[in-house]
């Protein structure tokens, strides 16, 4: 079944709701898309994520403008590289390298084998346990002013795990932040900033790659999905930043485990294929 505007809008809603929560937007898009009759695929996911990253840019626009400005001035020697905002720009650059390199090296596996629903179900519950442990036992004392180069790279490696559907980009980086002793707010804030270059570059790369292959893209539904993802994503960011200031990540841990059970049940019922290329997708 080809994707229509209604399906595109619904998938955009799913993307906007799940991109910034540590529950895996790619996993949800794969499940919902397949149940609707067509897995949206890696290209649709990447393009749709441009909408949610536009929401990040809009929400943190003042911080981002300051970071980019100071980082650019540090490039030409007008500011020292240890200036806090210039340094944040360099840390985001460093943290983007792992996902860029690994994404290119393992692109074929990401788009085929790793999109199997047994993989998604397993990563949902497995990383739920890791997130729960990090939130429970992490010291939650450090702020972003204490972010080191080593920690910046570790955040980047955690983000690279999100290449596997079901892990969650924000879930991976937030979990790493908690394990390293950062506050919930600091971990989430850096997670959102770190995602911007990776997701934007990935979206445009996927777009170029699909066009160069002659792949037909359902442009209108994809555009609708991207706009919906932007609006919903902006609201979710605002809500999440307020929520984690007074609450733990336990609700998301419980949700991930429940979602994993549902995915396994749907696989057993034959509604979802266990592995890419099998079953009814």
Curated annotation (Swiss-Prot):
The record lists the membrane-crossing segments as 90-110, 113-133, 147-167, 191-211, 217-237, 257-277
Query: What GO cellular-component annotations does this UniProt entry give?
Result: plasma membrane
Q: What GO biological process, any one, is recorded here? A: cell wall organization
Gene Ontology molecular function, alphabetical: undecaprenyl-diphosphatase activity
Question: By what name is this protein known?
Answer: Undecaprenyl-diphosphatase
Which HAMAP family does this one have? Undec_diphosphatase
Pfam families noted in UniProt: BacA (PF02673)
Q: According to its UniProt record, where is this protein mainly located?
A: membrane
| Catalytic activity field | di-trans,octa-cis-undecaprenyl diphosphate + H2O = di-trans,octa-cis-undecaprenyl phosphate + phosphate + H(+)
Q: What is its EC number?
A: 3.6.1.27
Its function? Catalyzes the dephosphorylation of undecaprenyl diphosphate (UPP). Confers resistance to bacitracin.
Q: Where in the cell is it found?
A: Cell membrane
Q: How does it sit in the membrane?
A: Multi-pass membrane protein
Q: What is the organism of origin for this protein?
A: Kineococcus radiotolerans (strain ATCC BAA-149 / DSM 14245 / SRS30216)
The record ties this protein, via InterPro entries, to: UppP
Keyword annotations of the record: Antibiotic resistance, Cell membrane, Cell shape, Cell wall biogenesis/degradation, Hydrolase, Membrane, Peptidoglycan synthesis, Transmembrane, Transmembrane helix
Q: Which family does it belong to?
A: Belongs to the UppP family.
Which additional comment does the entry carry? Bacitracin is thought to be involved in the inhibition of peptidoglycan synthesis by sequestering undecaprenyl diphosphate, thereby reducing the pool of lipid carrier available.
């Amino acid at each position: 079944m080809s994707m229509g505007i209604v399906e595109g809008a619904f998938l955009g809603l799913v993307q906007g709701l799940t991109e910034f929560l540590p529950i895996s937007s790619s996993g949800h898009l794969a499940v919902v898309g397949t149940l609707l009759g067509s897995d949206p695929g890696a290209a649709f996911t990447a393009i749709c994520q441009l909408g949610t990253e536009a929401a990040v840019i809009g929400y943190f626009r003042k911080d981002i403008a300051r970071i980019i400005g100071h980082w650019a001035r540090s490039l030409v020697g007008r500011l020292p590289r240890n200036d806090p905002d210039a340094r944040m720009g360099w840390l985001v650059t460093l943290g983007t390298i792992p996902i860029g390199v690994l994404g290119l090296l393992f692109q074929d596996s990401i788009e085929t084998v790793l999109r199997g629903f047994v993989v998604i179900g397993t990563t949902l519950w497995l990383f739920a346990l890791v997130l729960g442990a990090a939130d429970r036992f992490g010291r939650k004392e450090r702020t972003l002013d204490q972010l080191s180069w080593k920690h910046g790279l570790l955040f980047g490696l955690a983000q690279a795990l999100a290449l596997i559907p079901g892990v969650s980009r924000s879930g991976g980086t937030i979990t790493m932040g908690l394990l390293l002793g950062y506050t919930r707010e600091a971990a989430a804030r850096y997670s959102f900033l770190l995602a911007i270059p990776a997701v934007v570059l990935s979206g445009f790369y996927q777009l170029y790659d699909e066009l160069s292959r002659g792949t037909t893209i359902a442009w209108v539904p994809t555009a609708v999905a991207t706009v919906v993802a932007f609006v919903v994503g902006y609201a979710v960011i605002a809500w999440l930043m307020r929520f984690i200031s007074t609450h733990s990540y336990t609700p998301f841990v419980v949700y991930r485990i429940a979602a994993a059970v549902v995915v396994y049940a749907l696989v057993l019922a034959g509604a979802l294929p266990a592995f890419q290329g099998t079953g009814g997708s």
